[in-house]
């Protein structure tokens, strides 16, 4: 509460410094929040596109694998899958978006040639190749979706954190500082008025005393004591 603050000029200067710092911090955080929201909206648009792509690629891959099973049989499809020589490699790096560290997923060996798939020309068919192509494309989209979704969650968390800090400054700290500032200013003004009034009383009393002394001196001059 404001009454807990000692009304001194030193405290007033300290509070004014805190207000200045808090206002600048509030403005900076507001700019950061607005920038984060803009970045988040861009990522959200990208996430929606990626989700749509994943859904479409999944349906295509399912259709292709169902066709391969129907035409070539489960044994041939499983044999082609078991012949895979190299699995995809995924590495994770990071990038900074307005102070938020988000993942950047790099993948390799997702799209493969017939040799890399392991079953070769003789062990393959057009249906199995199409299914393999479809699932490789689906995997690429899933990897991208993981990157975008993680970035979106991290950005959203940072936005909420920044919002809370902005609100704490705007609705809690700054109002309390303004209240303390106003309280001290009022008390200092009261003290100043009281001091002026006290000095005026002292001055008036001194003037009265000086007048009395002057009157006494004048009376003594006009009515000197008789000589012996």
From Swiss-Prot:
It is found in: Cell membrane. InterPro entries: V_ATPase_D (IPR002699). It holds the Pfam family ATP-synt_D. Transmembrane segments: none annotated. GO terms for cellular component: plasma membrane. Keywords: ATP synthesis, Cell membrane, Hydrogen ion transport, Ion transport, Membrane, Transport. One of its GO terms (biological process) is proton motive force-driven plasma membrane ATP synthesis. It is a peripheral membrane protein. One of its GO terms (molecular function) is proton-transporting ATPase activity, rotational mechanism. HAMAP family: ATP_synth_D_arch (MF_00271). Component of the A-type ATP synthase that produces ATP from ADP in the presence of a proton gradient across the membrane. Has multiple subunits with at least A(3), B(3), C, D, E, F, H, I and proteolipid K(x). Belongs to the V-ATPase D subunit family. This is A-type ATP synthase subunit D. The gene is atpD.
């Amino acid at each position: 509460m404001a009454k807990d603050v000692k009304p001194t000029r030193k405290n007033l200067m300290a509070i004014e410094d805190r207000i200045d710092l808090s206002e600048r911090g509030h403005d900076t955080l507001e700019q950061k929040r607005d920038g984060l929201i803009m970045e988040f909206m861009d990522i959200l648009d990208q996430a929606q596109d990626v989700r749509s792509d994943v859904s479409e690629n999944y349906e295509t891959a399912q259709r292709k694998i169902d066709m391969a099973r129907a035409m070539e049989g489960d044994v041939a499809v499983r044999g082609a899958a078991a012949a895979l020589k190299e699995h995809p490699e995924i590495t994770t790096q990071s990038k900074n978006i307005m102070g938020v560290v988000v993942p950047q997923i790099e993948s390799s060996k997702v799209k493969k040639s017939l040799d890399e798939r392991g079953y070769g020309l003789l062990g393959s068919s057009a249906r199995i190749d199409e299914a393999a192509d479809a699932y490789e494309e689906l995997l690429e989209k899933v990897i991208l979706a993981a990157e975008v979704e993680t970035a979106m969650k991290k950005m959203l968390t940072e936005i909420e954190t920044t919002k809370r800090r902005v609100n704490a400054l705007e609705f809690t700290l700054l109002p309390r500082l303004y209240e303390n500032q106003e309280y001290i200013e009022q008390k200092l003004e009261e003290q100043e008025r009281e001091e002026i009034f006290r000095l005026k009383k002292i001055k008036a009393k001194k003037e009265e005393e000086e007048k009395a002394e002057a009157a006494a001196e004048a009376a003594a001059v006009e009515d000197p004591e008789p000589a012996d």
